[in-house]
Amino acid sequence: MIGKEATIPDIVLELQELVQPTDLHCYEELSEEETEEEPRFIPYKIVVPCCFCDSKLRLIVVATPFGIRSQQDLLLEEVKLVCPGCREKLRHV
């Protein structure tokens, strides 16, 4: 630097000395504990009324915790079950 004020070439030269190359490779390794587990299937007993005659219907399912919550939402809102007796009546309509 010559003179009282720094010029742009002087500043750029000073910055170039500070720039360090950065290694962008990831050397991280996952341990066995961090690997994703298989979803656990748990047996559940579902008891719901027939949508026509209110007789109890029992279902045994095997599901993940997420799966059983999804099934519950369906049975409470979008899907209704029909007993075998009412199914026969529907078949003849």
Swiss-Prot record:
Lineage top rank: taxon: Viruses
GO molecular function terms here? DNA binding; DNA-binding transcription factor activity; protein domain specific binding; zinc ion binding
Which BP terms does GO give this entry?
Answer: DNA-templated transcription; symbiont-mediated perturbation of host cell cycle G1/S transition checkpoint; symbiont-mediated suppression of host innate immune response; symbiont-mediated suppression of host type I interferon-mediated signaling pathway
Q: List the Pfam families.
A: E7
HAMAP family recorded for this chain? Answer: PPV_E7
Q: What is this protein called?
A: Protein E7
Q: Which InterPro entries match?
A: Papilloma_E7
Segments carrying the region annotation (E7 terminal domain) are: 1-42
Q: What does the annotation say about its assembly with partners?
A: Homodimer. Homooligomer. Interacts with host RB1; this interaction induces dissociation of RB1-E2F1 complex thereby disrupting RB1 activity. Interacts with host EP300; this interaction represses EP300 transcriptional activity. Interacts with protein E2; this interaction inhibits E7 oncogenic activity. Interacts with host TMEM173/STING; this interaction impairs the ability of TMEM173/STING to sense cytosolic DNA and promote the production of type I interferon (IFN-alpha and IFN-beta).
Give, as residue ranges, the zinc fingers classified unnamed.
50-86
Keyword flag Zinc:
yes
Reproduce the UniProt comment on modification after translation.
Answer: Highly phosphorylated.
Gene3D superfamilies named in the record: 3.30.160.330
Places the protein is found: Host cytoplasm; Host nucleus
Instruction: State the family it belongs to.
Output: Belongs to the papillomaviridae E7 protein family.
State the span of motif (LXCXE motif): 24-28
- Tell me the gene name: E7
Record's keyword annotation contains Lipid metabolism: no
> A single GO CC term, please?
host cell cytoplasm
Could you give the domain comment from the record?
The E7 terminal domain is an intrinsically disordered domain, whose flexibility and conformational transitions confer target adaptability to the oncoprotein. It allows adaptation to a variety of protein targets and exposes the PEST degradation sequence that regulates its turnover in the cell.
The UniProt keyword set, sorted, is:
Activator, DNA-binding, Early protein, G1/S host cell cycle checkpoint dysregulation by virus, Host cytoplasm, Host nucleus, Host-virus interaction, Inhibition of host innate immune response by virus, Inhibition of host interferon signaling pathway by virus, Interferon antiviral system evasion, Metal-binding, Modulation of host cell cycle by virus, Oncogene, Transcription, Transcription regulation, Viral immunoevasion, Zinc, Zinc-finger
Please report, in chain numbering, the residue ranges of the motif Nuclear export signal.
68-76
What is the documented function of this protein?
A: Plays a role in viral genome replication by driving entry of quiescent cells into the cell cycle. Stimulation of progression from G1 to S phase allows the virus to efficiently use the cellular DNA replicating machinery to achieve viral genome replication. E7 protein has both transforming and trans-activating activities. Induces the disassembly of the E2F1 transcription factor from RB1, with subsequent transcriptional activation of E2F1-regulated S-phase genes. Interferes with host histone deacetylation mediated by HDAC1 and HDAC2, leading to transcription activation.
